[in-house]
UniProtKB/Swiss-Prot annotation:
Descriptive protein name: Mediator of RNA polymerase II transcription subunit 23
Alphabetical UniProt keywords: Activator, Nucleus, Transcription, Transcription regulation
Chain intervals for the UniProt region annotation (Disordered): 1381-1499
Lineage of source species: Eukaryota, Metazoa, Ecdysozoa, Nematoda, Chromadorea
Gene Ontology BP annotations: positive regulation of gene expression; regulation of transcription by RNA polymerase II
Native source species: Caenorhabditis briggsae
Leader sequence residues: none
Encoding gene (name): sur-2
Length: 1589
């Protein structure tokens, strides 16, 4: 051996991990050295090298040696050896010199000979041989392509299973063809014909060598440009792609790029991934696996920006994006905002000359820009760059001041949040673009907003002085800056225009800026008339006599920074005030306008923080500092009075629950001492909490409730509040020191609102580990009021023992009678001691019932003082319990009265009115709340609702709301000053007193116990309670309400903050129960009182009787389109100011349309039919927009409308309409193309509406659709076209399931009960039954492609058993195409968890294997016994651990072990070669092949397919790292003892390990037994094959 052989070249040394033995590495290096010696040190080769390249057969000895060595290797070692040989060939070939070309060809030929000989002797598999032959070819074309070798490869292709073929085509396309030069001579192209033939054979669909979907994925993913140099291959690949066009279109909704939701839509749930993933740049790892299908460009996520655009451009639309800091939308904000600005500029150009620019949409755009930059969704430099480029192209200049105002807002307000320095040059360029050429400047000193925009450019340059941008100032800018400085020197606070400019241009840290904002704040708290410094609020509380708040026009002229400065000054006034001189109404109204014009985080958040802090301080009584206590309580009261009544509905409340949590914590703590101030604060905070939780949009209600109670007190022991909220019955008496914190009836109202929201939105919520079932079980529920409850809540109610929750009516009657009788027997003082100070639980809460009985018996007699003294000593919680006790007494008394009639209820109502309005012993809103919420049965609720009806109709109750109308009290938003003054007059006319004020006292000092009230009154407190009253009254009275009650209750809704939501929800939950005329009367009565409720004339005047249903639907759709598509000014039928509106313009038009349709006399079937006919009536400019609007309507309507659409869909089958449709018309998304030819088809329109309906609906409705409606559809499917028509609907639904982020987790949990699996199982069964009944199937190939796509993308192997059964019924050609669908090595039932091919499964397996690996290292001996314990009955048990063997036997055992290893090595050399590889068997034999004798290469192919099943990386390599000569798939395998390889060791190695502790005789017996077992398996397979054929 030469020196060179002893010391191999470092570049030739094999690099192996620890899994390979040193002997193996040594043998590999020896083979490489022998090959090198055979070629490079061959004397004959050197002599004949100039003459020929034919060496002759000089590899015979090497072949035999190589074969013997390979036969002793495991499969992994064989693969590693082949990889090293390939590296050897490529290493020589890459030395591109003239001498090395011949040598490289020789290396290739020798290695090929070795591989083919080893394959011939069955030492290596055909797959491994072909892979090696492919990779040794020199595709750099430095040497010739071996034609005979590639002919051999072509012949071997049919012998390889499809997983091996997939690897082969990957190697050819990705690893080899990429090496081709881009210019080839005709001769070299001709050499590559054999390679092209191999590829053509592999991708030929007719040969069916592997699933066509896999072929397509490999071709589209890995085809290099060099492949298109072969015309036949190029044509074949193009045809292959065209075959999958139907499947690609079928899995997408028709017109998907033009589908968009509406913010505040009941079915639009922002946190779901569906809408965010499409059009919002979501790069989910699960969206990659079938990108290889030839989708339309419109279906790419980046092309669906229209969805995001339509959400953003709607005012308040950004509030629906949740969570706000998600990066999914980040890259799209800048171009979309730029487009919106230029679009508004274009519309401004079209305005008449001299007309003022409407700022409705400009304010929205400014708010969007500020929101995007503050949340780091918009980069200033990129944004201004985009905007400058668009303006440069469009040349719009009229709205240049609005654009500069946006720039100024960014520069002025966000300098601490963003790096404005990077965008200075872009701002300068944008200014030059806007003010290029001659132009005229327009400003108005008497118009603050116009003045601020006129000087916005100059103010911007003043703030950018630090960045030296002022050096590029124009003369105009310099003159404007001079004007600003002169105005600062001659500061005039009365000049509102310049005041706004100065507040914007000078920061608070400058000398001028430090004077301006405090001067503005001082103006709000300085009375205009010094002689009248204060103004009397309700109950003679004094406030600063200033009502002139800053107008909206002035606030719109301030930047966000200036507004925040002013907000801080106002809040500082609220922190320091005198109880005899409260903050002015002007300060409150200015604060309200700032809060409504800014986002929650910029304004309301600071106010709520101050209110929460004030609440905390006010509950800490300081005995030594009474003045501080009173001031803290005053501050707490007027702040929550402002939040509850002036800002009852801020759209971002639903995202933040901190204030709600603070209120709950307040109620959790005991309120002490028992003072009238504490009573008033308690009642106010009850209202604040009720409004915060009850008046929410539907999705906000679900989110709010889930955030607060989405965990149980058992799961979250640290949350004390949840423990308190366990049982409502503990409100009066604590149990185990836990007491329900707030009024149980208020909390019950919020549960009703939560249940209605679940019904309307169709959402499903998690229940395990939450408080929701506990809360439902804690109450009694009248059955008529639970018709809309979800199934889980009804089941919880059934399990609840109603008798335990029912009050003891007999005890209540006797206790009340005794207390009433004792009033005549005891003196006043004795009576007070017994019923106020004695904590007897039976009599402690009966006083209101006693007073009620007293007034019933003697209505004309005044109440004596002892009653007031008893009430004075009750705590706020006691008053709540006493109110419920009163209702229980009334119910018991009515039930006990045998002569109960209508007059009885009138008497009760009249007495209650005396209590509430004349004697002030009880609050009317509290009494009404107890009446409608406290009853727990239908019988009790029926009694209480009749009393409530009569109570509302009493003169004393009616005169209060009529006083509002007679005095024309305006809404707070419309004229807040007149409203505050009216509230003062109202309380003068109808005062409400505390109990302490009604007790005559000798030492009365005249102290005013009333808290400061600016906005609250009885009318306001009644609004949320009347909402619930209407629901209960309709439910308990058969959804009828008297006209007198309807007219009375509707009067309150002039002041309701969410009247449209209320009307919509009432009609939704009562749909199908309230008769048409009653619904019309209900809507008309309420709509007449609501200022922003603009219904169509057709409904208001003619009740939808004048025109056809199609014309009605078209009018509603036109209104919706107008509210969504406006650019500058919204249509007249929506709110005029989006900042104070109940909802966005599009949502308002949608809700009003739904209200009309639900109250319409026409049936849902007739209206749905009209919606379909609309598409046939006239050509539509934007047909997909019409479809989308129809779907938005249907998803916002009750389920009966969807049922009508479902029946229309079934009618297509019944009428045989699919027979008139071509296959292409059904599956392809070409509806708009057919409309261009004026060929609308009703069947296609129905399918389109259904597709978009199920796209827009809530995800929770999809599983019921799969389980209930799909079977009904398939019952009517008779022909192949019917089935394709059904697939056109259900495949986009399966796709939507798949787009859900928790798709894999849900599939694993539900298995075959999961929607996509249910649908696909029904489809497969239907196709099988159709084939069995003789239905002709024309489009067989698309069906097969569809099933493969569904398997590898949507359903995996869960339906394998169904497929085996049903595919056997199909025609032979389809069975042949689908033979790979169920091809697996080991069949397993669906229950086997190992068959789940989900991403989460990989992580779980990895964690389990890592744990096993750790256990193996901790106790290797136990691990060895667990892994390799022999399972043969003749095998002896293994030896005990060494520590258990006696010392004198240990040496003997080691000698015996060494002898066994020698015998084992000798026996392994004598063992026969492995059996024929499984890929040579038919595929149905592969399915039944036993796992033990399977070759390792087949197991690894199968392992790769199983690990990449769905839904993610089915068709993809790992992206990181270089693919080492194309052999990474096999060669870079992990360590066999690594957790990933445990359980996958080669069978032969397992046999070796099992024989480790055997005697030589046992080893021979075991080897013979295994050989016989393999023979038996082969016979069994042949028998099964014969049976199958």
């Amino acid at each position: 051996m030469t020196e060179k052989d002893k010391a191999p070249n470092p570049e030739d040394v094999i690099e192996m991990d620890d899994s390979f033995s040193p002997q193996f590495v040594q043998e590999v290096n020896r083979v490489k050295s022998q090959i090198k010696s055979l070629i490079e040190n061959n004397t004959t080769l050197r002599f004949f090298k100039p003459l020929t390249s034919n060496l002759g057969d000089v590899t015979a000895i090497l072949r035999i040696s190589f074969n013997n060595m390979m036969s002793k290797m495991e499969e992994k070692e064989k693969q590693s050896l082949v990889k090293e040989l390939i590296k050897l060939v490529h290493h020589v070939a890459e030395k591109n010199t003239q001498d090395k070309v011949f040598i490289a060809a020789s290396y290739e030929r020798v290695v090929d000979e070795l591989l083919r000989y080893a394959n011939q002797k069955e030492v290596i598999s055909t797959t491994l041989c072909v892979e090696g032959l492919i990779m040794t070819s020199d595709f750099r074309m430095c040497s010739r392509i071996d034609q005979e070798k590639w002919k051999f490869i072509k012949e071997c292709i049919p012998k390889i299973d499809y997983k091996g073929i997939r690897t082969i085509i990957r190697y050819i396309l990705e690893s080899q063809l990429r090496r081709l030069p881009y210019q080839l001579s005709p001769e070299k192209v001709n050499e590559l014909r054999r390679v092209e033939d191999v590829l053509l054979k592999i991708v030929d669909r007719d040969l069916n060598l592997m699933p066509p979907l896999i072929t397509l994925s490999e071709v589209m993913r890995g085809t290099p440009k060099q492949a298109h140099m072969f015309p036949r291959l190029t044509e074949k690949l193009a045809n292959l792609s065209s075959h999958f066009r139907p499947i690609a279109d079928l899995t997408h909704v028709c017109g998907r790029p033009f589908i968009y939701p509406i913010p505040f839509h009941p079915a639009f749930h922002p946190p779901t991934s569906y809408w965010e993933d499409f059009g919002m740049n979501a790069q989910s790892p699960y969206t990659q696996s079938h990108h290889m299908l030839p989708y339309r460009p419109q279906h790419k996520a980046a092309s669906c920006l229209y969805t995001f655009y339509m959400i953003l451009r709607q005012p308040l639309g950004k509030d629906s994006l949740n969570p706000t800091n998600r990066n999914k939308t980040k890259s799209h904000w800048e171009p979309l905002l730029s487009v919106m600005i230029v679009e508004a500029m274009a519309e401004t150009e079209a305005l008449p000359e001299g007309k003022q620019i409407p700022r409705y949409q400009w304010d929205n755009i400014t708010n969007l820009v500020m929101y995007g930059m503050s949340h780091l969704l918009v980069n200033p430099k990129n944004f201004f760059h985009y905007l400058k480029g668009l303006i440069n192209q469009c040349k719009y200049t009229r709205a240049r001041d609005e654009v500069m105002w946006i720039v100024f807002q960014v520069v002025s307000s966000l300098h601490k949040m963003i790096k404005i320095e990077d965008a200075v040059q872009e701002i300068v360029d944008l200014y030059n673009e806007l003010f290029d050429g001659e132009f005229s400047w327009h400003g108005a000193s008497d118009h603050p907003a116009r003045m601020a925009r006129f000087l916005a450019a100059a103010s911007t340059w003043m703030l950018l002085e630090k960045n030296k941008a002022h050096k590029q100032n124009t003369d105009t800018i310099k003159s404007h800056i001079k004007v600003i400085h002169e105005a600062a020197l001659n500061f005039d606070p009365k000049n509102m225009g310049m005041l706004a400019v100065l507040a914007n241009a000078f920061k608070s840290d400058t000398r001028i800026g430090a004077q301006i904002v405090p001067a503005m704040s001082e103006a709000l708290n300085t009375p205009p008339d010094p002689s009248q410094p204060t103004f009397d609020l309700s109950y003679q509380r004094k406030a600063v006599n200033q009502f002139d708040a800053f107008p909206k026009e002035f606030l719109d002229a301030l930047t966000s920074r200036a507004k925040r400065s002013l907000l801080g000054q106002i809040l500082s006034v609220f922190r320091s005030f005198g109880t005899d001189k409260l903050p002015s109404p002007a300060a409150f109204e200015t604060l309200a306008r700032i809060c409504q014009s800014e986002d929650y985080e910029m304004a309301v958040k600071d106010l709520e923080s101050l209110a929460s802090r004030s609440l905390h301080i006010s509950t800490q009584e300081r005995a030594a500092d009474i003045a501080t206590n009173n001031q803290a309580k005053d501050q707490c009261h007027f702040l929550f009075d402002f939040l509850a009544y002036r800002l009852p509905h801020v759209h971002s409340y639903g995202k933040y629950t901190s204030t709600t949590g603070s209120l709950l914590l307040y109620f959790t703590a005991s309120v002490a001492p028992n003072t009238p101030q504490n009573h008033q604060v308690y009642r106010l905070l009850e209202q604040a909490l009720l409004r915060r939780m009850y008046w929410r949009t539907f999705h906000e209600s679900v989110i709010n409730h889930s955030q607060l109670f989405g965990s149980s007190y058992k799961e979250n022991s640290n949350n004390v509040m949840l423990r308190h909220l366990k049982n409502p019955k503990t409100f009066s008496t604590p149990v185990d020191q836990w007491q329900f914190p707030l009024n149980p009836e208020i909390f019950k109202m919020t549960i009703y609102a939560f249940m209605r929201a679940l019904k309307i939105t169709g959402q499903e919520i998690p229940l395990d580990g939450t408080m929701h079932p506990i809360h439902v079980a804690g109450y009694g529920w009248p059955e008529k009021s639970t018709t809309f409850f979800p199934k889980w809540a009804l089941e919880e109610i059934k399990k609840t023992d109603v008798k335990k929750l029912a009050p003891n009516y007999a005890e209540i009657l006797s206790t009340t009678d005794e207390a009433f009788r004792m009033n005549t027997l005891l003196t006043g003082g004795q009576y007070v001691i017994r019923y106020a100070d004695d904590p007897n639980p039976i009599t402690y809460h009966c006083m209101l019932a006693v007073i009620f009985k007293q007034l019933c018996s003697k209505p004309e007699q005044d109440l004596t003082s002892e009653y007031y003294q008893v009430m004075e000593k009750k705590s706020p919680k006691d008053i709540v319990v006493m109110g419920n006790y009163l209702v229980d007494f009334i119910i018991a008394d009515v039930k006990n009265n045998q002569d109960c009639n209508e007059q009885t209820f009138k008497t009760i109502a009249k007495t209650a009115a005396l209590m509430c309005f004349h004697f002030n012993i009880h609050r009317a809103d509290r009494f009404l709340l107890s009446l409608i919420m406290h009853p727990s049965t239908d019988e009790d609720a029926q009694i209480c609702i009749q009393i409530a009806n009569e109570f509302l109709l009493t003169p004393k109750f009616q005169e209060r709301i009529k006083w509002f109308y007679e005095n024309d009290v305006p809404r707070k938003e419309k004229d807040p000053y007149e409203y505050i003054k009216a509230i003062v007059k109202y309380h003068d006319a109808f005062p409400e007193f505390e109990a302490c004020q009604l007790v005559p006292k000798n030492d009365d000092t005249g102290t005013n116990v009333h808290m400061p009230t600016y906005y609250g009154c009885l009318i306001e407190r009644l609004l949320p309670i009347l909402d619930q009253y209407v629901y209960v009254a309709l439910e308990q009275q058969g959804y009828k309400m008297s006209n007198a009650l309807l007219q009375l209750v509707s009067m309150f809704y002039r002041y309701h903050p969410m009247p449209i939501h209320f009307m919509y929800s009432v009609l939704f939950v009562s749909h199908g129960k309230m008769a048409g005329p009653d619904a019309k009367s209900f809507v008309s009565a309420f709509a007449s009182q609501i200022e922003e409720c603009h219904l169509t004339e057709e409904f208001e005047k003619y009740n939808h009787q004048k025109s056809s249903c199609e014309e009605l639907i078209m009018e509603l759709l036109d209104r919706m389109a107008a509210s969504l598509d406006f650019v500058l000014t919204p249509p007249t039928f929506v709110a005029k100011d989006w900042r104070t509106a109940e909802m966005s313009p599009g949502a308002q038009a949608l809700y009003l349309a739904c209200i009309e349709l639900m109250a319409s006399p026409h049936s849902p079937e007739k209206l749905v039919n009209a919606m379909i006919n609309v598409m046939q009536m006239r050509p539509h400019l934007r047909p997909f927009n019409v479809f989308n609007l129809i779907a938005l309507l249907l998803t916002a309507l009750p389920s009966t409308y969807a049922d009508a659409l479902h029946e229309e869909f079934i009618g297509v089958f019944k009428n045989g309409e699919t027979a008139n449709l071509k296959f292409e018309e059904i599956v392809f998304d070409n509806y708009d193309s057919s409309l261009l030819l004026h060929l609308p088809n009703r069947a296609r329109s129905i399918n389109m509406i259904a597709q978009i309906y199920w796209t827009q609906c809530n995800m929770a409705l999809l599983n019921p659709f799969a389980n209930d409606q799909v079977p009904k559809l398939l019952e009517h499917v008779k022909t192949e076209k019917d089935l394709w028509y059904t697939l056109r609907l259900v495949m986009p639904i399966i796709r939507r399931f798949w787009d859900s982020w928790d798709f894999a987790k849900t599939m694993r949990a539900l298995r075959e009960r999961f929607g996509p699996l249910v649908i696909m199982k029904l489809i497969i069964e239907k196709l099988g039954s159709m084939a069995e009944s003789g239905v002709e199937i024309v489009h067989e190939a698309p069906f097969c492609d569809l099933f493969y796509n569904c398997k590898y993308v949507f359903v995996g192997d869960f339906l394998r058993e169904t497929a085996i059964t049903e595919f056997a019924k199909l025609p032979e050609a389809m069975r042949e195409r689908l033979k790979y669908y169920v091809s697996q090595n080991e069949p397993a039932p669906p229950e086997t968890p190992e068959r789940e091919k989900t991403p989460e499964r990989k992580d779980q397996q990895k964690e389990q294997q890592e744990q096993q690996h750790q256990q193996h290292h901790q106790n290797p001996q136990l691990h060895h016994e667990a892994q390799h314990h022999p399972h043969h009955p003749h095998q002896q048990p293994s030896m005990p651990p060494p520590q258990l063997i006696p010392q004198h036997h240990l040496q003997h055992h080691q000698q015996q072990l060494h002898h066994q290893q020698q015998q084992q090595q000798h026996l392994s050399q004598m063992m026969p070669p492995p059996q024929q590889p499984l890929q040579h068997l038919p595929h149905h034999q592969m399915d039944m092949a036993p796992p033990t004798p399977a070759p390792m290469h087949h197991q690894q192919h199968q392992m790769a397919m199983h690990q990449q099943m769905y839904p993610g990386q089915m068709f993809h390599h790992p992206q990181g790292g270089h693919m080492g000569y194309g052999m990474q798939h096999h060669m870079q395998q992990p360590h066999p003892h690594h957790p990933q390889m445990q359980g996958q060791m080669p069978s032969q190695m397992q046999h070796m390990v099992r024989m480790h502790n055997m005697t030589p005789q046992q080893q021979q017996q075991y080897a013979y037994m295994m050989q016989q077992q393999q023979h038996h398996y082969m016979q069994q397979q042949q028998h099964q094959q014969h049976h199958h054929m």
